[in-house]
Amino acid sequence: MFRRFLLLAPLALLPLTTFAAAPLKALILTGQNNHDWKLTTPLLEKALTDTGLFTVDVAVSPPKGADMSAFRPAFSDYAVVVSNYTGDAWPADTKSAFVAYTRRGGGFVVVHSASNAFPDWPEYNAICGLGGWEGRDERWGPWVYWDKKIIRDPSPGRGGDHAPVHSFVIDVREPNHPITRDLPPAFLHAADELYNRLRGPAENLTVLATAYDKPFGAGSGRHEPILLTVTYGEGRVFHTTLGHVRGDPTAMRSVAFIATFQRGAEWAATGKVTQPVPSDFPDASALRLR
């Protein structure tokens, strides 16, 4: 009996060893940004690895104004690409490889100002859905905001603005989406830029969550998109407007940012979210930082 047990024991372990899911490969693009990319990139990397789902590589571009011809990340090696990049244009073959990767089913995550990059690259604007600044106006597409439903407003005007940094409540608009499923209907985020007046093609776009932008400073007085998804070909895109960091990393220490970023990255990579909502996720009355 004992000898038979020894023979069967390795077979009993097979489901654990042979069929354990391989980690998802994630790539963070960075190296140029109008925010502190040397501070934010490790925070994004930690958020991904803390899930236990991802291994992470980082592709750092040449500095602004330098020769970009050798910047050619191997997008197709990864389940998801995270952009923490706002800077010089990529080489033509890198742009083509990125579009092909996304169209064929690659996952893409847009963090904060990454959606403001490449205003003259139509495919990138379509992939992000919305963007701002860099000369964007009604030619790039409508403003998108929430007024009991998604509003696509073609009125003329600049794309992209924000009031001074402040804390705000985020309202879930699509509670049945895998990213937002089981989240509180409203939750408090740390001091951050609340982007407003974003515009773009807004095709195949779903707004998952919004925040009311109080009409002070450059505030719009409207409910602005905060978390959104875009379908581009077979690719899944998660776009978070959160994550303003210039010296003070509070916005990326917010559990509201961390958990939605983690869930969005998993969804972009796989189409599913297996992570439970963390026990320290905030409601609308209590801020949570890590």
Show which residues each predicted segment covers.
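Catalytic beta-strand/loop cores that center a nucleophilic Ser/Cys/Thr
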Residues: 49, 55-57, 77, 146-236
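Helical hinge/lid and interdomain linker segments adjacent to catalytic or ligand-binding clefts
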Residues: 21, 25-32, 36-118
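A glycine-rich, often tryptophan-bearing local segment used as a flexible ligand/cofactor-contacting loop or short
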Residues: 29, 88-178
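Extracellular ligand-binding/catalytic regions of CAZymes and related secreted enzymes
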Residues: 21-24, 39, 50, 73, ...
